[in-house]
Amino acid sequence: MKITSFQVDAFTDRLFGGNPAAVVLLPEYPGDDLLKSIASENNLPETAFVVPDGQYFRLRWFTPDIEMDLCGHATLASAHIIFSQTGYMRDTIKFRTVSGELIVKRCSEGYEMEFPLREGLKSELPKEIFDALSIKPKEVYKSRDYLLIYDKQE
């Protein structure tokens, strides 16, 4: 299997700025062990693996250690590579991911991304987290992660 890989610095217009991600274009997904090995070898915060799937692209993200369920900068990097390196002519890319459909549009200012909403529900922190905070939050919400609301920024 031929593997084509790129390194992209997302969220910047200058070399060595932004947030780095590897983008690997594949005709199909190999086993997870190979994906993990490639990500580990890249040794970047994220490696995105992109596979064409009809009108969509399937997308998965790995750190050097684990698979992630969502990664904004590696999604942006993947869209940039598809738009700039593959001859893709449409102005919209639809990615299929474990987090749902992600859309990246080419626009005059660069790219625009649409991600699924992860609405948080009012919640309480686990005691060990709450006890570890020096400043207690006014409100707590939980979706995949916790969101803490404070009266003022400190």
Description of each model-found segment:
Residues 1-70, 76-154:
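Active-site proximal loop and beta-alpha junction motif in alpha/beta enzyme cores
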